[in-house]
Curated annotation (Swiss-Prot):
<keyword id="KW-0028">Amino-acid biosynthesis</keyword>
<comment type="similarity">
    <text>Belongs to the eIF-2B alpha/beta/delta subunits family. MtnA subfamily.</text>
</comment>
<dbReference type="GO" id="GO:0046523">
    <property type="term" value="F:S-methyl-5-thioribose-1-phosphate isomerase activity"/>
</dbReference>
<dbReference type="InterPro" id="IPR027363">
    <property type="entry name" value="M1Pi_N"/>
</dbReference>
<protein>
    <recommendedName>
        <fullName>Methylthioribose-1-phosphate isomerase 1</fullName>
        <ecNumber>5.3.1.23</ecNumber>
    </recommendedName>
</protein>
<dbReference type="InterPro" id="IPR000649">
    <property type="entry name" value="IF-2B-related"/>
</dbReference>
<feature type="active site" description="Proton donor">
    <location>
        <position position="254"/>
    </location>
</feature>
<keyword id="KW-0486">Methionine biosynthesis</keyword>
<keyword id="KW-0539">Nucleus</keyword>
<dbReference type="GO" id="GO:0005634">
    <property type="term" value="C:nucleus"/>
</dbReference>
<feature type="site" description="Transition state stabilizer">
    <location>
        <position position="174"/>
    </location>
</feature>
<dbReference type="InterPro" id="IPR037171">
    <property type="entry name" value="NagB/RpiA_transferase-like"/>
</dbReference>
<dbReference type="InterPro" id="IPR011559">
    <property type="entry name" value="Initiation_fac_2B_a/b/d"/>
</dbReference>
<comment type="pathway">
    <text>Amino-acid biosynthesis; L-methionine biosynthesis via salvage pathway; L-methionine from S-methyl-5-thio-alpha-D-ribose 1-phosphate: step 1/6.</text>
</comment>
<dbReference type="Pfam" id="PF01008">
    <property type="entry name" value="IF-2B"/>
</dbReference>
<comment type="function">
    <text>Catalyzes the interconversion of methylthioribose-1-phosphate (MTR-1-P) into methylthioribulose-1-phosphate (MTRu-1-P).</text>
</comment>
<dbReference type="GO" id="GO:0019509">
    <property type="term" value="P:L-methionine salvage from methylthioadenosine"/>
</dbReference>
Amino acid sequence: MTRAHNATLESIQYARGTLRLLDQRKLPFETVFDEILTVDDIWTAIKEMRVRGAPAIAVSAALAIAVAAGNELKKNDGACNSVDGTRRFLLESCDTVMTARPTAVNLSKTLIRLKRDIADVTANTAGGLVEACAVLAEKIYAEDVAYNEGIMRHGAAHVTQLVKKSKVSVITICNTGALATSRYGTALGVVRQLFYEGKLEQVYACETRPWNQGARLTVYECVQENIPFTLICDSAVSALMGSRPIDAVIVGADRICRNGDTANKIGTCNLAVAAAHYGVPFFVAAPSTTLDPMTADGESVVIEERETMELTHNMATQQRVVAEGPSLRIWNPVFDITPAALVTGGIITERGVLQPSATAPFFDITRIVGAS
């Protein structure tokens, strides 16, 4: 049974016409909500990782575009002074926001859907079109909450059935909980459900360098709900699996290709390789909006690379901690690709669980989302 939502973990505050997003860069020490008024505001919030997590990015983008259009409508000389102008503003806003982060497919899929639906809306006034956009965005928001609940339910049942233990110990990476989604989470949502059902022994949270989403955000969520956890550095996962009873690795995803190859936070593939070596089932938990049947495999995924200072500086103090010199080279990919062959436990979605085949191709996600 899903528990009531913990409002402390709310990262999206929305009411028709207003949107405030939790600046997750400042957690766990400060709780600061930024008001989102314009398209530039949401593009910057996504790009600068004030809002993060593939589902949360997509939902926030849709809501923000509706809010931005409403604010534009209030201007006498704004872009939304006619039905045609409003439609053009909404469609162009979707295109702009889509460029903020390239790897997470939820953002592009959600905004492509919003564009299609806006193009189909029949409205007699600019205000009517803005209201229709708000209704569409609110539907996307509500759907993500339902997706969270389905993933939790299917995931907890599948993990306990496969592991066959009364209590399980789990490793996860990054933050895939309420802060990364609209409500409960994906991979951390499954962990939550195991905890709610009294079936969680311990969750081991990887710190997740360089942004430390595991240390800052996953630990924050576990503390808020008294979930039993242990924080580990990313490089400790093999030692952990080799020395303590670990029953499952559960991770989220930013894009799952047609064959099951999974783009997720850098370090996920390391986890999968270690899990395969030690015989630990490896699960991916994500909503169907993360499934990308148009991308055949991981080789086709564009991997975002971020600023070098994320590695050369302490992210909290902004103090440089790496020596400078002409021979210094830095590579800072945000995501890696976990081959489908290493997703041994299955892909958990709100619609059920895709279990791997014994031979390649190990998955065919079109069984859930169709070919396009």
